[in-house]
Amino acid sequence: MEAGERRNGDSMSHNHRAPKKPRLAGLLTESDIDSEFAHHQTGVARINNGSFGCCPGSVLEAQREWQLRYLRQPDEFYFNGLRRGLLASRTVISDLINADDVDEVSLVDNATTAAAIVLQKVGRCFSEGKYKKEDTVVMFHCAFQSVKKSIQAYVSRVGGSTVEVRLPFPVNSNEEIISKFREGLEKGRANGRTVRLAIIDHITSMPCVLMPVRELVKICREEGVEQVFVDAAHAIGSVKVDVKEIGADYYVSNLHKWFFCPPSIAFFYCKKRGSESDVHHPVVSHEFGNGLPIESAWIGTRDYSSQLVVPSVMEFVNRFEGGMEGIMMKNHDEAVRMGLMLADAWGTNLGSPPEMCVGMVMIGLPSKLCVGSDEDAIKLRSYLRVHYSVEVPVFYLGLRDGEEGVKDKDSGLITAYVRISHQVYNKTEDYERLRDAITELVKDQMTCQNLPAL
């Protein structure tokens, strides 16, 4: 068997192009959208799309077809269908993100996998003596916890050090973030050290803020940072992604959050610069050493169907007015509108101005709820789920000495925020249910200290 015949996802072994789009049906009506998401649990205000995303019924049907195709004849699927299907998905994504070459795009399970790929490479450079002990990785303090754990597992234990930049929150401007980031880079270079990697969120998770990613990457280039990894778990489907404009070495975004794919799938962009062979998938298969796109395309027998439905997702989004751009714009505008409604009802604030929001918005909770810890935030979130059928994350804002914070209409310090999401299936009533639940808790003088145990 020729090597090229067995390399799943290898664009060099097939002159494959994404299939032409079939003639689509008309624009989706509100009833059509309800039908697409009829599998969602009824009676729940599901305003947390940011955590786990959603997948329409038509895409789930397409996924089931891929699964059955494998089960009918696994060998034929492995040697033909899988290879071609993965390349079709990668080609769609490559075009969407304006990559120079489809071979800059790999499909992995999630952003956590991509972070492991990057940080394992950095760790190897420390272990092999290419980097000096105490050279640094710079990131924001609110980086996703799995990224921090990967640094601990792969970098810190072999001599690398970490500088965490505190993200201002609530935040009022990009300039506040840029100023803090410059301070972090300066700290990372102290005592003759070299900043080997900067990790930048495109959209932070908790708290949620749209970051000035292009400006931050540009600063990294000006300041001599060796490599830049953008963790954009929430980006594709939320904001325009142009990897050439952004200019990072590595960029990852989940497609199961805001891009309607079933879990789990993310694209991982690795800029071509001659050293791609140093980057490997954490799961080693017989494709090791054949390039990351090929390594990622076969990590052993498993269900690859979520990575094969990207063309079907495009068919779905193109049935909305304006396509993906129209969806992103509406989600942003509705999330901001609902956020302002909640802030007005509770006498609080937004965590960032509308231009620094996406389809997710942070809204301050009334101080009378007395959220005083992460445990209180979890308790309140669980209470809202069980007693009000509202699914929304609660973020505890731990102020440090010297930080003044923001006060609500009762002159109390705002110590917690909810993060609402808006996706095409959401309705105004979902947010009104949250509004009324919080208002009722405050009226009944309920605090996190006297909420009954669940």
Swiss-Prot record:
It catalyses: L-cysteine + H2O = hydrogen sulfide + pyruvate + NH4(+) + H(+). It is an enzyme of class 4 (lyase). Its EC number is 4.4.1.28. GO terms for biological process: L-cysteine catabolic process to pyruvate. Highly expressed in stems and cauline leaves, and at lower levels in roots, rosette leaves and flowers. The keyword Lyase applies. Residues 1-25 are annotated as: Disordered. The modification N6-(pyridoxal phosphate)lysine is found at K257. The keyword Nucleotidyltransferase does not apply. Pfam families: Aminotran_5. It comes from the Eukaryota. Catalyzes the production of hydrogen sulfide (H2S) from cysteine. Is mainly responsible for the degradation of cysteine to generate H2S, a regulator of stomatal movement and closure. Belongs to the class-V pyridoxal-phosphate-dependent aminotransferase family. This is L-cysteine desulfhydrase. It comes from Arabidopsis thaliana.
